[in-house]
Curated annotation (Swiss-Prot):
Major location (coarse): membrane
Organism listed in the record: Octopus vulgaris
GO biological process, any: positive regulation of hormone secretion
UniProt KW keywords: Cell membrane, Disulfide bond, G-protein coupled receptor, Glycoprotein, Membrane, Receptor, Transducer, Transmembrane, Transmembrane helix
Name by which UniProt lists this protein: Cephalotocin receptor 2
């Protein structure tokens, strides 16, 4: 979130700047009169901020609770990828309750109404939630990187490894948020004004630039570089294996041209060029979450760097609206997960007719799977001459054996009947 902070400059009077200290929206406190010691807000813009914050808070709570409900409903079958999604939803809920909600209340009251301890805690929690959400996303990308690029080492994974990565994300968020609790405190907005707020005075002025760059590197640039490396490696590995599979297929067709004449051969559907569909789906899911993260946060950090070199951007309504995109990230992550896992949504549908439809779809899928397996077996039998001759030989042998057994079993019965008939006639 953002809160206006005063920076002591060389000019006679101080001025208020919007600066990123939370997870979503900056407040619009600024001086209309440079000779005034009290900031005046743009109330129209504040109302827009409050409306957007309230909407984002509601959507973040509802959407992430839906994801948690789906995952907890399937808690006995939760896979490693879903564990990361579970904690990402928890992080987004922390963003909603400890970042968006305090900022919403703060915008309504204009001044922070709690004490110094609560001021430091809220500021710490706001940054903690942001770091946690970001670094859980990074650990998810690292896990997909190991699964795709290093499959042999990935074979030995245990649930403990997943929990270790999640613990690392929590530890990084805990440590990186400490400066926020040190800098902010309840103090006078302007010395001698008698107005107290959860505030920070950056003295000298270069401390503000240093802290802004610290947040930029820790929360955006370094995570983006890690995400680019992991997904660049994943894309290259998938492309290389796809190319190798195509080359191998061409070589096989060149060496054994008669195989190209086979009919009725159905390819396996649970894997694509050595990767399972579930693994590829998890890669697509993580990639979508990362792209959304970049889209939501890039305008904010670009504006922050711009603000460091151009102070006239402060109070610009257009810039504030652009910065509102950052809070959408906690709302969009659940949508992405549910879109990529539509079959899980039916697990929590309360309507019996919808559940019946789910069962019918599952039965149809199972029938198609079984029929596909039978067709595949039949195609293998009909496409191989050796199998055809072997199956015919076995069936002929069984038919001859059955006739022999029938003749052997029917002969004594016929003889016995003849004896009985002869006895009666005599």
């Amino acid at each position: 979130m953002y809160q206006a902070m005063e920076v002591e400059s060389t000019s006679p009077s101080g001025f208020f700047l919007d600066f990123y200290t939370q997870s979503t929206i900056p407040t619009t406190d600024f001086l209309n009169n440079t000779n005034s010691s009290h900031p005046i807000r743009d109330e129209k813009l504040v109302k827009i901020e409050i409306a957007v914050l309230g909407t984002c808070f509601t959507l973040a709570i509802i959407n992430n609770l839906c994801v948690l409900l789906v995952l907890l409903w399937r808690r006995k079958k939760v896979r490693r990828m879903q564990m990361f999604i579970l904690h990402l939803s928890i992080a987004d809920l922390i963003v909603a309750f400890f970042n968006i909600l305090p900022q919403l209340i703060w915008d309504i009251t204009f001044r922070f109404m709690a004490g110094d301890a609560m001021c430091r805690f809220i500021k710490y929690a706001q940054m903690f939630s942001l770091y946690l959400s970001t670094y859980i996303l990074i650990m998810t990308a690292v896990d997909r990187y190991r699964a795709i690029c290093h499959p042999l080492s990935n074979q030995t994974w245990t649930p403990c490894m997943v929990y270790c990565k999640i613990f690392i994300a929590y530890a990084i968020a805990t440590i990186f948020s400490i400066p926020q609790a040190i800098l902010f405190q309840m103090q006078e907005v302007n010395e001698g004004s008698g107005i107290y707020d959860c505030w920070v005075h950056f003295e000298p002025a270069w401390v503000l630039t240093a802290y802004a760059l610290y947040i930029f590197f820790a929360l955006y640039l370094i995570p983006i570089l890690i995400l680019f490396f992991t997904y660049g490696s994943i894309c290259y590995t998938i492309w290389a294996k796809y190319r190798h599979a195509i080359k191998t297929k061409k070589d096989a067709n060149t060496r054994y041209p008669q195989r190209r004449k086979k009919k009725g051969v159905i390819l396996r559907t649970h894997s694509v060029h050595g990767f399972s569909k579930a693994k590829l789906n998890s890669v697509k899911l993580t990639f979508a979450v990362i792209v959304t993260y970049i889209i939501c946060w890039s305008p904010f950090f670009v504006s922050q760097i711009w603000w460091l070199f151009d102070e006239t951007v402060v109070g610009n309504a257009g810039v504030v609206v652009i910065l509102l995109m950052a809070c959408l990230n906690s709302c969009t992550n659940p949508w992405i997960y549910l879109i990529f896992n539509r079959n899980y949504i039916s697990n929590v549908l309360p309507c019996k007719c919808l559940r019946r439809h789910r069962v019918e779809v599952a039965a149809t899928t199972e029938t198609e799977r079984l029929s596909l397996g039978s067709v595949r077996r039949d195609s293998r039998k009909t496409s191989d001459p050796k199998r055809i001759s072997e199956s015919r030989r076995i069936s002929d042998a069984r038919r001859i054996s059955g006739k022999t057994q029938k003749n052997n079993s029917s002969s004594p019965r016929k003889t016995s009947d003849q004896f009985i008939y002869s006895d009666k006639t005599t």
